[in-house]
Design a protein with these regions (language model features):
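SAM-dependent methyltransferase catalytic region
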Residues: 1-215
Length: 215
């Protein structure tokens, strides 16, 4: 490597979420640039329907990504809230704690993406780990929830998502790709179970996963 090339590389600090390869058809990671464009559109729509208010300055708004993969939406929402709430909560630690405990929530689509998403928002794959920037979570999930979910088979199809039993009835060693958010008859009760207490989300945003096959 030349001295010039080495200097150029030392000056480059790429966003790690732009450097991760997609894992499968249903784990196509949203580029940060696209996520931010969507959040810009969200802010415009919020202002248009809420008397011109800035969503990023509201400490009561709750956000949910129901199909979290890299955690890019949760991370970028957090970054915007950290800036927007500076006037209301001038102490940075208090501000970050409030945002990540009370405003930003995700439901991961696989075990691997749950770890990746937590790393993106908590700086630790375990929300209550020693490296986590939030010190008061009682579980390793924090507010980025994941647990293995099974399909509900009826006439060779999942009665919730329509997936083929032939394709998706898999062993314990493989992911089921049954997404918890749509595999329930009562999402409000499930959200209360996952995150504790009655939950009401003001914003639901994300990039829904693709299916592994089209049958």
């Amino acid at each position: 490597m030349s001295a010039q090339a080495g200097f150029a590389l030392r000056g480059r600090n790429p966003d790690v979420l732009t450097c991760i390869a997609n894992l499968s058809n249903d784990e196509v990671f949203t580029p940060p640039e696209l996520a931010n464009r969507m959040l810009d559109t969200l802010a415009e729509a919020w202002a248009a329907t809420h008397g011109g208010t800035d969503i990023w300055t509201d400490s009561s708004v709750k956000f949910l990504d129901p199909c979290t993969k890299s955690g890019v939406f949760l991370r970028e929402i957090t970054i915007r809230l950290i800036k927007g709430l500076a006037g209301e909560k001038p102490d940075l630690d208090e501000r970050v704690h409030h945002i990540l405990k009370n405003q930003v929530f995700g439901i991961a689509i696989t075990n691997l993406t749950s770890l990746l998403a937590r790393r993106s928002v908590y700086c630790s794959k375990h929300a209550k780990g020693i490296h986590s920037i939030v010190k008061t979570f009682a579980t390793d999930d924090g507010n980025v929830w994941f647990a293995r979910t099974e399909h509900s088979w009826k006439n060779s199809r999942c009665e919730y998502c329509g997936a083929s039993e032939t394709t998706y009835r898999r062993g314990e060693a493989l992911e089921t790709h049954a997404y918890a958010f749509i595999h329930t008859d009562n999402i409000k009760a499930k959200a209360a179970e996952w995150f504790g207490g009655k939950m009401q989300f003001d914003v639901i945003i994300g990039n829904p996963p693709y299916q592994l096959a089209s049958d």
